[in-house]
């Protein structure tokens, strides 16, 4: 929903033109794409809650397993401010995250919530719990990865994902 968010709000972001050119700007087209068959048994999607502004469809959320990754606000603000000057409350996404959590709950689902602090403290234990919660087989290989980008990274990765691209595991 990144391009749809930028198109709707008019907020200026780094790499904006590349983002707008790379994705649907119509949030209904994005939602339709999220539910399209992928010919894979597992289809991981990462969404930034701040991109889920008013008018972004929510019905698709009833058809997926929703996991909310939370992080201490001070860490979020500090990280975001390194990449974009003068962040506002809605840039961080906490209000939207609460609304999305309430929406998922209203669907009769019990959303899974994972605190990033807990993952950093006990990566293996938390990843096992998360796998159990979403019905995936645990594999210790999930704890480490090669440094660098991933084929599924968006065009914005070079700006936003520097720390992730340098990491090789949760403790990095």
Label for each model-derived stretch:
Residues 66-67:
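A mobile, often basic/glycine-rich helix-loop segment
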Residues 1-38, 143-172:
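PAPS-dependent sulfotransferase catalytic core
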Residues 32-55, 114:
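Glycine-rich phosphate-binding loop used to anchor ATP phosphates in small-molecule kinases
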Residues 15-22, 88-92, 159-169:
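A polyampholytic, Gly/Pro-enriched intrinsically disordered region
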Residues 57-63:
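Short, conserved loop/helix-junction motifs that constitute active-site signature segments
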Residues 5-10, 56, 79-81, 125-127, ...:
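Short aromatic-enriched loop/helix-cap "lid" or pocket-rim segments at secondary-structure transitions
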């Amino acid at each position: 929903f990144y391009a749809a968010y930028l198109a709707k709000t008019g907020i200026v972001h780094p790499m904006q033109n590349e983002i707008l050119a790379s994705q649907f700007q119509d949030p209904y087209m994005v939602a339709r794409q999220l539910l399209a068959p992928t010919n894979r048994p597992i289809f991981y999607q990462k969404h930034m809650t701040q991109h889920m502004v008013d008018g972004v469809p929510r019905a698709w959320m009833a058809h997926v397993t929703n996991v909310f990754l939370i992080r201490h606000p001070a860490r979020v603000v500090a990280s975001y401010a390194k990449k974009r000057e003068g962040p506002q409350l809605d840039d961080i996404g906490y209000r939207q995250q609460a609304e999305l959590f309430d929406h998922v709950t209203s669907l009769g689902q019990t959303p899974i919530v994972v605190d990033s602090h807990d993952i950093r403290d006990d990566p293996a234990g938390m990843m096992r719990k998360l796998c159990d919660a979403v019905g995936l087989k645990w594999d210790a290989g999930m704890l480490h990865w090669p440094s660098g980008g991933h084929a599924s990274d968006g065009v914005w990765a070079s700006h936003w994902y520097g720390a992730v691209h340098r990491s090789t595991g949760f403790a990095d």
